[in-house]
């Protein structure tokens, strides 16, 4: 059987900076059955080739709903679609016999765009979360469960491990999984970040002492740990944990928090919400800067409705590219001064954006 797999993000060039794990598992599953599998691009797929059955079967996966694809490719009888870009709530996951097959890391051979495609083993040790964040793909989950042992997706020829777990710090077997990862001798990283609110000092020390990925340098000082600060209601908890973290940290490293903005949990998106949203966003960023932590601003698609659209874009540009501040380039002094120049920039820019715009009821940005 001839199998064509389509990675919508990868071949569209929009967001395809990471291999599609589900497609790699599907590929290996079929190869084990003796089938021929190839990565297919949109330019090779058209209504004629699709309906003339150039391939016996197509698997199409899309991670992001915003990724545009030709409408006709979903209409073939031999077409199977999946991924969070099509089904946001995991309604159509892989069968167990495919889910627990080792990924086919050769699927993207010759098409690699970065080190994720050829240097990392990729997989989940746990799945799920109990936070029920309304913007999250796991909003209908109520627990964190063990998914697979590390050896299930480990390619011993690859130097690093990338974990896609949703909330590893919320799993009861947290320490056992870190021991399992450390035992491989390979540096590893949790791409989705970790839940900072759940970090006890014991868990912090387990993370610090682990064989965590540090990029091109082998120094612990080159490590970057990712967390999230999405809700202003977590302010006191994050502040308390940051104080514990920086009071006990054994070596210097980078701490980055994803900061969500522009999302209304009540789904009303009124002027009052956007006023509060920008203030809450600034307050969260200021707290992180005060400790020397990094803020990485994540803008929900509805931020475009905000009267403070321009400030949110400014904040994103400043925080996510820290050497670029208000159109001027700065050197390492920004990082060495623990982001205080960025803190001052926000302080000086806040008043000019936070004037109530009484005549603005809604804003549409093209």
Locations of regions flagged by a protein language model:
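Core AdoMet radical
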Residues: 5-8, 57-63, 137-242, 252-261, ...
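A general structural detector for well-ordered alpha-helical segments in enzyme core domains, enriched
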Residues: 26, 68-75, 177, 203-207, ...
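Conserved, mostly hydrophobic/aromatic
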Residues: 30, 129, 133, 163, ...
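A structural motif corresponding to the C-terminal lobe/cap of the Radical SAM core domain
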Residues: 214-224, 233-366
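Ser/Thr/Gly-rich flexible loops in soluble cytosolic domains mediating phosphotransfer, phosphorylation
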Residues: 79-110
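Canonical Radical SAM [4Fe-4S] cluster-binding loop centered on the CxxxCxxC motif
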Residues: 16-22, 116-157
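Anion (oxyanion) recognition and catalysis
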Residues: 31, 182, 286-290
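A short, structured N-terminal alpha-helical element that caps or precedes a catalytic domain
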Residues: 1-81, 85-89
């Amino acid at each position: 059987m001839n199998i064509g797999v389509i990675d919508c993000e990868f071949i569209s060039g929009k967001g395809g900076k990471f291999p599609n794990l589900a497609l790699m598992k599907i590929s290996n599953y079929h190869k084990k059955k003796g089938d021929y599998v190839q990565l297919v691009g949109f330019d090779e797929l058209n209504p004629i080739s699709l309906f003339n059955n150039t391939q016996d079967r197509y698997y199409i996966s899309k991670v992001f709903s915003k990724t545009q694809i030709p409408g006709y490719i979903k209409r073939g009888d031999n077409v199977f679609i999946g991924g969070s870009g099509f089904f946001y709530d995991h309604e159509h996951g892989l069968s167990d016999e495919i889910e627990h097959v080792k990924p086919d890391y050769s699927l993207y051979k010759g098409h690699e765009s970065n080190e994720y495609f050829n240097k990392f083993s990729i997989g989940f040790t746990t799945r799920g979360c109990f936070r029920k964040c309304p913007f999250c793909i796991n909003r209908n989950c109520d627990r964190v469960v063990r998914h697979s042992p590390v050896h299930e997706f480990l390619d011993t020829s690859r130097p690093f491990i990338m974990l896609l777990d949703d909330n590893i710090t919320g799993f009861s077997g947290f320490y056992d999984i870190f021991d399992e990862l450390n035992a491989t001798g390979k540096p590893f990283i949790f791409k989705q970040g970790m839940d900072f609110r759940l970090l006890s000092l014991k868990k912090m020390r387990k993370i610090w002492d682990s064989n965590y990925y540090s990029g091109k340098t082998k120094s612990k000082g080159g490590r970057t740990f990712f967390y999230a600060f999405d809700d202003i209601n977590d302010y006191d908890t994050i502040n308390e944990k940051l104080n514990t973290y920086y009071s006990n940290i054994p070596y210097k490293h980078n701490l980055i928090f994803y900061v969500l903005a522009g999302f209304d949990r009540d789904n009303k998106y009124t002027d009052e919400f956007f006023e509060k949203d920008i203030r809450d966003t600034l307050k969260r960023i200021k707290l992180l800067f005060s400790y020397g932590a990094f803020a990485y601003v994540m803008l929900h698609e509805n931020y475009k409705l905000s009267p403070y659209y321009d400030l949110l874009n400014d904040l994103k540009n400043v925080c996510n590219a820290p050497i670029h501040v208000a159109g001027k380039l700065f050197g390492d002094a920004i990082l060495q001064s623990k982001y205080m120049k960025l803190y001052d920039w926000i302080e000086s820019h806040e008043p000019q954006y936070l004037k109530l715009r009484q005549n603005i009821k809604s804003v549409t940005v093209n």
